A protein has these predicted regions:
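Alpha-helix-centered segments that form part of catalytic cores
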Residues: 132-138, 190-203
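A solvent-exposed, charged loop/short amphipathic helix patch at secondary-structure junctions
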Residues: 165-191
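Metal-dependent active-site segment of extracytoplasmic phospho-/sulfohydrolases and closely related
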Residues: 209-220
């Protein structure tokens, strides 16, 4: 029997609750909570959710908990990216909030597509050896139980931005490059990270199709 789903994705742009940081979390919540509520999403994918720390406890997503408080999402199943220590990353976590049970969760980062090696040609001092170029954040892959023996495969991904990656000796300050060539190489490396991770997503999708006997794709 067909099922109707509302899936939504939302980049919350470094959602955090740092003291004195503007705009204040309360001000952001006043704007964002009504927007998220209006989505009425069965499954909500979020990007750039920062983690917060409490003394003696693992880093968690406290700012997100405050954002969804009092909304239907407060009772949803949750999966998010974690460090090797099992706690949320300090910045830019991926999160899935689901009305349906999350049956499995997996992080993928240079697992299906190994890190390429590259020697920067504009670095100061010059690099003599190639170095690994890895993705900046993982892919979050979850499966959801839709009932009646149906599984939804969901991939939440936040690709590298087009902002040039740093090149040793080529930055005067955070916003100023020493040479256009240095800027161009930084842009190239960012492109390498972005396209490489997109390749890893494509490989993952192909593996899902191979491993599952019955796959339905809805493009609506």
């Amino acid at each position: 029997m067909p099922i109707s789903l509302r899936l939504a994705t939302f980049n919350v742009e470094n959602l955090d609750d740092k003291p004195g940081e503007l705009p204040l979390l309360a001000d952001r919540i006043a704007v964002m909570r009504p927007q998220l509520t209006r989505l009425r999403a069965d499954v909500l994918c979020l990007q750039e959710v920062n983690g917060q720390e409490r003394t003696g406890q693992p880093r968690t997503l406290l700012a997100l908990e405050k954002l969804i408080q009092g909304t239907p999402y407060e009772t949803y199943h949750v999966s998010h990216t974690v460090t090797t220590g099992g706690e949320a990353y300090d910045v830019r976590n991926l999160v899935v909030l689901s009305r349906f049970l999350i049956t499995a969760s997996q992080q993928i980062k240079n697992t299906l597509a190994p890190k390429p090696r590259y020697r920067k040609v504009t670095a100061i001092p010059a690099e003599s050896d190639a170095e690994d170029i890895g993705w900046e954040r993982p892919i979050l892959y979850v499966t959801l139980d839709l009932g009646e023996n149906r599984t939804l495969h969901l991939i939440n991904v936040h690709l590298k931005s087009k902002i040039p990656s740093d090149i040793s000796g080529q930055k005067i300050n955070q916003y100023t490059w020493r040479t256009v060539a240095g800027w161009a190489e930084g842009y190239f490396i960012s492109s390498m990270k972005r396209v490489g991770q997109a390749l890893e997503v494509r490989i993952l999708i192909d593996r899902i199709f191979v491993s599952s006997q019955k796959i339905m794709v809805n493009t609506n």
